[in-house]
């Protein structure tokens, strides 16, 4: 199996790489950081920032030329930081979060889509978030980026309908990763990354259009989407906020 994963140096990306690694696998691992672990099979690292579209295009061309179109591409790279939506000083953070979580995701999948479409097979998967269903105080940049990722993946799915290429949107809740370990509040239904990777892989194998992980967060997401605005505003305003002093 030929699998490409972005953000593969830690967290969910590392767990997914470990999950898919086997003596028969070929993994293209894309990250701006070094990989502090070894895997079975053929592993091809690419030191690429997903905000660098030309570099992504070169990495995709190299992988396809050497191994053929991937069976699966997972756009996982992401960043998160607390923001104040009413402060001009935080617009720079918003721009950076959107560049990675939305533009980087779109560029990753678009770099590999033509070869997969020509082959008439494969799966393009994007890691969004439960945070993309409603806006949260102090977390506007992250919520906006994930909401945009959800709708962008939906658009991509409809565009590729009938091509043989599937598009899967994964919306995790809290996963125990370096990104969430900076949070200074209790995170309900927290999953270890290895378990998250297993559940994500199952959803991808089933070609689910949209999968919320874990199931408890799926129930919460349904409630969030139907909750009246007046009630949601009261609850969300009192919710704990992500730290603003995080390097992204």
Predicted regions and their residues:
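Residue(s) in the substrate-gating loop at a strand-loop-helix junction
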Residues: 129
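Rossmann-fold cofactor-recognition segment
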Residues: 41-54
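Conserved glycine-rich cofactor-binding loop
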Residues: 9-10
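Active-site helix of classical SDR
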Residues: 109, 145
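Conserved mid-core segment of classical short-chain dehydrogenase/reductases
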Residues: 80-95, 138
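Conserved glycine-rich Rossmann-like NAD(P)H-binding loop of the short-chain dehydrogenase/reductase
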Residues: 23-38
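C-terminal helical subdomain
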Residues: 169, 185-221
